[in-house]
UniProtKB/Swiss-Prot annotation:
The gene is rplS. It comes from the Bacteria. Belongs to the bacterial ribosomal protein bL19 family. Disulfide bonds: none annotated. Gene3D superfamilies: 2.30.30.790. GO terms for cellular component: cytosolic large ribosomal subunit. GO terms for molecular function: structural constituent of ribosome. This is Large ribosomal subunit protein bL19. GO terms for biological process: translation. This protein is located at the 30S-50S ribosomal subunit interface and may play a role in the structure and function of the aminoacyl-tRNA binding site.
Amino acid sequence: MADLLKFVQNEFVAKKDFPDFGAGDTITVFYEIKEGEKTRTQFFKGVVIQRRGSGTTETFTIRKMSGAIGVERIFPVNLPALQKIEINKKGAVRRARIFYFRELTGKKAKIKDKRR
């Protein structure tokens, strides 16, 4: 059964070429929104909190501050509405899931840049 799922995922799911990113990176996600007859492109810029899953069920969570309110959005990697992902900044974190980032405020909420 697992082999059948892998076969279907590999054959029929369209692979998109997104850059490699992980927790702590600041990225901008451009996605398409349909409002009635019109379609427009909207972007969501924030810090990646986690990546989870594999294959067709892989998702990533982005957090941004809108005023004083934190907004999180979960995107499936294989979402057809995703147009492109830009990496704005690589962050140096030691965890794969940085949920502690939700409680941090002010200068503590800054993520250091990854050294090259």
